[in-house]
């Protein structure tokens, strides 16, 4: 935040009337919401009044809620913040007062005021989600059904009075990274069929529907996917030391490690397959590879336990000569975007 302000001052000095036009700060969940009182604090240090700084903040910040789970709806104890960040604590109390004043002015019911309160009296804590919702210019979920949930349930009181603040922005990927860069062979095939405009106009890929029954195109597509799978297997052999031979079905689960994301369920399924193969219950089984890629939050000990558990299952399976010709497990090391490009291609 300090760097953003310094860069602005380099262009405009201490005239902050253009600040909101030139800067936009995205809050992904509530972890970075401290940027709101921090911006106000920095602007106040520069001589901007609290109300003017709050007005700027309301134009600069936008808030994305990714999940309604408590881990994404942080609360910070007032006693703790007063001890370690006294200025930030005072600014949050001021924002809470501003919110209460607006709620009275706009006729919020007592229930609505309680639901949107920044200072939660019963918990003696600040709600970072309600701070973001009050200040943010725009609020969005990351899928249509999720956006409806936050409007209907999570932030219903704010939505009832300020529906214009709420939008849906469906999570997605860019075709330039995840298709053109990650899979140049498939990009070349697509270019041959529909031209190159899909790089800038995503909807152009819809023209591929005309080729879903074209045997020649489908054959080339299968060849490309086979080539990319072979490239991935060779990369895994080089990076992980796990040799994968022959035609195998690839089951990949690559995402942040969390209990609700069901990696543990996949691990149970893998273990069940292993013991069924050992017992001779699966006579007609296509050789398969189960690939995991994930990281956990530093303090999420249960997630770390799941990672350890999955790796132990993989060690068991890959070391068994009875099954490792038909079933292989891989937990990739240092899973990142570059690795993901190879997996999804």
Q: Language model features by range: what are they?
A:
Residues 1-345:
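A conserved ligand/cofactor-binding region detector
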